[in-house]
Design a protein with these regions (language model features):
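Hydrophobic transmembrane alpha-helices and their helix-loop junctions in integral membrane proteins
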Residues: 185-246, 255-617, 632-640
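Membrane-entry segments of alpha-helical transmembrane domains in multi-pass membrane proteins
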Residues: 2-19, 37-47, 160-179, 219-226, ...
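Hydrophobic membrane-spanning alpha-helices of multi-pass integral membrane proteins
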Residues: 19, 416, 442, 536-538, ...
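Membrane-interface interhelical loops and short amphipathic "cap" helices
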Residues: 1-10, 67-76, 137-165, 236-246, ...
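Hydrophobic alpha-helical membrane-embedded segments
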Residues: 56, 183-187, 497, 588-597, ...
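Transmembrane helix-loop-helix hairpins at membrane boundaries of multipass inner-membrane proteins
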Residues: 1-14, 33-221, 225, 301, ...
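N-terminal signal-anchor/start-transfer transmembrane helix
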Residues: 17-32, 384, 388
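Aromatic-capped, Gly/Pro-kinked transmembrane alpha-helices
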Residues: 125-170, 643-690, 701-837
Length: 837
C-alpha cells in the first residue's frame, strides 16, 4: 500500500468520511428490517464510525507523523520550559507552496504597474509589521504543509469552479481523529441510552393524547440514521477544500441538528427548539454568504489551497507564478513577507484609476482592508450562529430537548465545534480589526453564558450554558491572536464536555429527571458516573499545579488562553485589559457552577427519596465510554502527546508573528509565542489557579458544607437572580424585537391577502362566472345545444314516422316488396330509355 502522504491521506480520510454516509444510506432503506425493531441499525452505525476512527488513526500515526516532523511545541511544554525556542524547520520535501510564493504573483505585478500609491502603502505597512515582528523575535511563518486536490468537478461557470475536493493538513487529521473518537463513544453510549426506542410501542410520558400517554412506534434505527448523517456532515466540513463545499456541509449539519434536536417531535418543546435552532442559524448563514461572495468576487476562487500535482507539489506557470492560487496565498504572498495584504484584485478598476488626493486614500491597504473586514465579519457571522455566540446564542440551551447523546455530540465534536474550526481555518483571511470583533463577541459570550449557568437547575442546561461560555473562550483566544490556544481548547473541551453530557445522561437515565433540586447523594448509587463526572469538572475548570506540567487537559488549554489575553493586554494596554479580566472572572464562574452541579447531584442528602431509591448505575455500554473519555479528559493535553506540536505544524501562513491594524492603527495582535514569556506564565498561571480555587471554594461553602443558604442568597440578590434566571431576558427581548413584529407583519399580510387579494380573486371569479353564464345561455344553450337538440328531435320524429310502417302485418310487407320491385323496374326502364334516346 502506498503510504506517501499525497496519495494515502486523501484516500484514508475520504474512506473515513464516507463510511458514516454508507451507514446512513443503508439504514435509510432497510433500517427497520435490521434485526428486531431495527436493533442492528445501531450496531451498523457504531461499526461505521469506529472504522472511520481507525482509518483516521492510520492517517495520523502511519502516514502523517512518520512523514512530518513535529516542531518544538510551546503550548503544554510551556508549563515546564521557561525559555522560548524557535520553530523547527519544516521538511523541505513537504513545504508546499513556499518556493512558488517567492516568485512575483500576477496580482502584485499588476499593483506595481497600476498603483504606485498602493505599493507605497504596502511598503509602509510592511515596515510597521516587520518592526513588530522584530520586537517579537519571530518572522512570519511560511505556508504550512498541506495537501490539496479535487476528487470531482461539478462544473465551471466563468471564473467559478465548483468541485468536491480536500484540504488536508495537521489540523484536518487531528480533527478527524477527535471527531470520530468522540462520535464512536457517543454511538456506543447511545446503544444503551436509546434502548427504550426498541420497544414497540414506545411510551412517551411527556406527551398526553386524549388523556393518555403517547404510544408510538420506536425510532431506534432512525436515531442512528440521523447520527450517521450528522458525523458525515461534520467530517465534510473538516476535509473540505473550498468555501462552497464548506457551505454545503455547513447547511447539512444544520439540517441534521434540526432532525436530532426535534427527534421527539411530538413534544411541543422539542419541535419548537428544532425550529429555533434552524431559524437562528439561518440568520448567521446570511452573513456568511455575504462574506463568501465578497471573497469570491475579489479573489476569483473558492479554493483554500494552491493547485498541486499528484506528488503534492504546487503547480507553477512557465514564469514561475502559481498556476491556480488559492485564497490564502493571494492574501499572504511571499513578496509581502506572508503578511495580510489585500491584492490589487480587491480594489475595483475604476477606483484604482481615480486620481488620489492622498496616498492613503488610494491605497489598497485602506480600501482593501475594508473589504477584508466585511468578508471576515461575514464569515464570522456564520460561525456566530453555529457556535452559539452572542447574540445568536439563544438556540443552544433549547437544543437540550434532543436526546442526551445528541447533546453530547452537538456540544463537543460536531455542530458548535464547526464554528470555531471555521474561524481557525479562515484565520489567514482575518484582518486585525476582524479579529477584534471576534474577541469582543467571544468575551461577551463567555461572561454572559457563565452568569446564566450559575442559576440554572436543569443539569443539561447548566452544561449547555457552560458550552456557550467555553466557546466564547475559544473565540476570545482566536480574536486575540491565540490561534493555537483557541484550537487547543477546542480539542480538549470536546473530550471533557462530551464526558460531562454523557454523565448527565447517565444520571437522567437513572432518576428520570433533569432537575438538580430533585437529586442529591447519588455518588453512592452511581460511583462510576459520579467520579468520571468529577474528572470532567476538574478538567473544565483547568485543575492543575501552577507552573508545572501536572494537571488535567483544561489546565493546559485554558491557561494558554489566559496567557494570550495577558500578552494582548500588555501589548495594547488601556481597555484591552478587559479581555483578560473577563477571562479570569469567567474561569472563576466556571469553577463555581460546575462544582455547584456536582455537589447538588452527587453529595448531601437525597432531596427526592423516591427517585433516589430507584437510582442505579448505568449499564456497561454507557459507563464504558465514560471511563474512556475520562482518561482523555485527563491526559489528552499532556506535553508527552505533543498535541500542540500538531497544531503548530498547521499554523496558518503568516500568522505566527502577529500583526498590526490598518483601520485601527494602534491595534497590535501580538505573536502567540510572546505569551510564553516567564513573567506572563507566572502571573497568568497564578491568576487562573486562584480564580478556579475561589469558584470551587464558593460552591463548596454554599452547596457542600451549607454555610450559606441558597434560598437566602436568592432573596438577598433577588433582582440579579431574577435577571439571570430569565437568561438576561434575551428570549423576551427577541420576542419583542423580532418574533412579535414578524407575527404582526404576518397577520397584516394575511389580512391583506384575505381582504384585498382574495376579494380581487373572488371578484374576478364572479365576473368570469357571469360571463360564462351568459355564454352558456346564449351560445351554448341556444345555438350549440339548440342545434344538437333540433337534430335529435328531427331524428326522433323521423323515427316515429317510420315506425308507423312497421305494423308487423305480413301482407303489408309483401305489398311493400311488390311495390319496391315495381318501382325498381320502372326506374330501370326509364333509365334505359333515356340512355337510348
Amino acid at each position: 500500500m502506498d503510504l506517501t502522504p499525497a496519495t494515502a491521506l486523501p484516500k484514508l480520510l475520504a474512506a473515513a468520511w464516507l463510511l458514516p454516509l454508507a451507514s446512513f444510506v443503508v439504514i435509510l432503506f432497510v433500517g427497520k428490517r435490521l434485526g428486531p425493531h431495527g436493533k442492528w441499525a445501531g450496531y451498523l452505525a457504531v461499526g461505521a464510525i469506529v472504522s472511520a476512527f481507525l482509518l483516521s488513526c492510520v492517517a495520523m500515526f502511519a502516514v502523517w507523523l512518520p512523514n512530518h516532523e513535529l516542531p518544538v511545541a510551546h503550548h503544554g511544554e510551556h508549563h515546564e520550559e521557561g525559555d522560548h525556542h524557535d520553530d523547527a524547520p519544516a521538511d523541505d520535501d513537504h513545504t508546499h507552496g513556499t518556493a512558488a510564493l517567492l516568485h512575483e504573483s500576477p496580482q502584485t505585478a499588476q499593483a506595481d504597474r497600476e498603483s504606485p500609491f498602493q505599493l507605497a502603502a504596502f511598503q509602509e505597512d510592511a515596515a510597521h509589521a516587520d518592526e513588530h515582528a522584530a520586537e517579537a523575535g519571530h518572522a512570519a511563518n511560511p505556508p504550512p504543509t498541506y495537501y490539496f486536490g479535487d476528487w470531482y468537478s461539478l462544473g465551471e461557470f466563468g471564473r467559478l469552479k465548483l468541485t468536491i475536493g480536500y484540504y488536508i493538513d495537521a489540523l484536518t487529521v487531528t480533527m478527524f481523529c477527535m471527531v470520530t473518537l468522540i462520535a464512536s463513544c457517543v454511538h456506543i453510549y447511545a446503544l444503551g441510552y436509546m434502548h427504550d426506542e426498541l420497544h414497540d410501542p414506545y411510551h412517551d410520558h411527556e406527551v398526553i393524547v386524549h388523556g393518555h400517554h403517547l404510544h408510538r412506534p420506536g425510532r431506534f434505527h432512525r436515531f442512528f440514521q440521523y447520527l450517521s448523517l450528522f458525523c458525515f456532515s461534520m467530517l465534510g466540513i473538516v476535509i473540505a477544500g473550498n468555501v462552497a463545499m464548506v457551505f454545503v456541509f455547513w447547511e447539512l449539519v444544520g439540517i441534521c441538528s434540526y432532525f436530532l434536536i426535534g427527534f421527539y417531535f411530538e413534544r411541543h418543546s422539542a419541535s419548537t427548539a428544532a425550529n429555533k435552532a434552524f431559524i437562528v442559524n439561518r440568520v448567521g448563514d446570511f452573513g456568511m454568504l455575504i462574506g463568501m461572495m465578497a471573497l469570491w468576487a475579489s479573489l476569483g476562487t473558492f479554493a483554500f489551497g494552491d493547485k498541486q500535482d499528484a506528488k503534492g507539489q504546487t503547480v507553477l506557470t512557465e514564469s514561475g507564478a502559481i498556476a491556480e492560487p488559492g485564497i490564502f496565498s493571494q492574501l499572504r504572498t511571499a513578496e509581502n513577507g506572508f503578511r495580510l495584504v489585500p491584492p490589487a484584485s480587491m480594489i475595483a478598476e475604476e477606483t484604482r484609476q481615480q486620481p488620489a488626493i492622498e496616498a492613503e486614500d488610494a491605497a489598497a491597504g485602506k480600501a482593501g482592508h475594508w473589504l477584508l473586514l466585511i468578508a471576515g465579519v461575514g464569515i464570522f457571522c456564520g460561525c456566530v450562529g453555529k457556535s452559539a455566540q452572542f447574540p445568536l446564542h439563544v438556540w443552544l440551551p433549547d437544543a437540550m430537548e434532543g436526546p442526551t447523546p445528541v447533546s453530547a455530540l452537538v456540544h463537543s465534536a460536531t455542530m458548535v465545534a464547526a464554528g470555531v474550526y471555521l474561524v481557525g481555518r479562515f484565520y489567514p483571511a482575518f484582518c486585525p480589526e476582524a479579529l477584534l470583533v471576534i474577541a469582543i463577541i467571544g468575551c461577551i459570550t463567555l461572561s454572559l453564558a457563565a452568569t446564566i449557568a450559575i442559576t440554572a437547575t436543569d443539569i443539561k442546561r447548566v452544561l449547555a450554558y457552560s458550552t456557550v461560555s467555553q466557546l466564547g473562550y475559544m473565540m476570545l483566544a482566536l480574536g486575540l491572536g491565540g490561534w493555537i490556544a483557541g484550537l487547543f481548547h477546542l480539542i480538549t473541551h470536546a473530550f471533557f464536555k462530551s464526558l460531562l453530557f454523557m454523565c448527565s445522561g447517565s444520571v437522567i437515565h437513572a432518576v428520570h429527571t433533569n432537575d438538580m433540586t430533585e437529586m442529591g447523594g447519588l455518588r453512592k448509587k452511581m460511583p462510576i458516573t459520579a467520579y468520571t463526572m468529577l474528572i470532567g469538572c476538574l478538567a473544565i475548570i483547568g485543575a492543575g499545579v501552577p507552573l508545572t506540567p501536572i494537571g488535567f487537559s483544561g489546565y493546559f488549554s485554558k491557561d494558554s488562553i489566559i496567557e494570550q489575553a495577558w500578552s494582548h493586554a500588555q501589548t495594547n494596554g488601556g481597555g484591552y485589559w478587559a479581555f483578560l479580566a473577563m477571562a479570569v472572572i469567567g474561569a472563576s464562574m466556571t469553577a463555581f457552577y460546575m462544582f455547584r452541579l456536582w455537589f447538588m447531584t452527587f453529595t448531601g442528602a437525597p432531596r427526592d427519596h423516591h427517585k433516589y431509591d430507584h437510582a442505579h448505575e448505568s449499564p456497561r455500554v454507557m459507563t464504558g465510554p465514560l471511563v474512556l473519555l475520562a482518561i482523555f479528559a485527563i491526559a489528552v493535553a499532556w506535553p508527552a502527546f505533543r498535541l500542540t506540536g500538531l497544531l503548530e505544524q498547521a499554523q496558518p501562513v503568516g500568522t505566527a508573528a502577529g500583526g498590526s491594524g490598518v483601520l485601527i492603527e494602534d491595534l497590535v495582535v501580538p505573536a502567540e509565542h510572546l505569551s510564553h514569556a516567564p513573567d506572563i506564565k507566572l502571573r497568568a498561571g497564578l491568576a487562573a489557579f486562584s480564580s478556579a480555587l475561589i469558584g470551587v471554594f464558593g460552591a463548596a461553602v454554599v452547596y457542600l458544607w451549607g454555610y450559606l443558604n441558597p434560598s437566602e442568597i436568592k432573596q438577598t440578590f433577588k433582582p440579579i437572580y431574577t435577571l439571570l434566571w430569565n437568561k438576561w431576558y434575551f428570549d423576551q427581548l427577541y420576542n419583542i424585537l423580532f418574533v412579535r413584529p414578524a407575527l404582526f407583519i404576518g397577520r397584516q399580510i394575511a389580512a391583506f391577502d384575505r381582504g384585498v387579494i382574495d376579494w380581487f380573486l373572488h371578484a374576478c371569479a364572479w365576473f368570469c362566472r357571469l360571463i360564462s353564464s351568459v355564454f352558456a345561455f346564449v351560445f351554448d344553450g341556444a345555438l350549440v345545444d339548440g342545434t344538437v337538440n333540433a337534430l335529435a328531435r328531427w331524428t326522433w320524429d323521423f323515427g316515429l314516422l317510420l315506425r308507423r310502417f312497421q305494423t308487423g302485418s305480413l301482407r303489408q310487407y309483401v305489398l311493400f316488396i311488390v311495390m319496391g320491385t315495381w318501382f325498381m323496374c320502372l326506374a330501370y326502364f326509364a333509365a334505359a330509355f333515356v340512355l337510348m334516346s
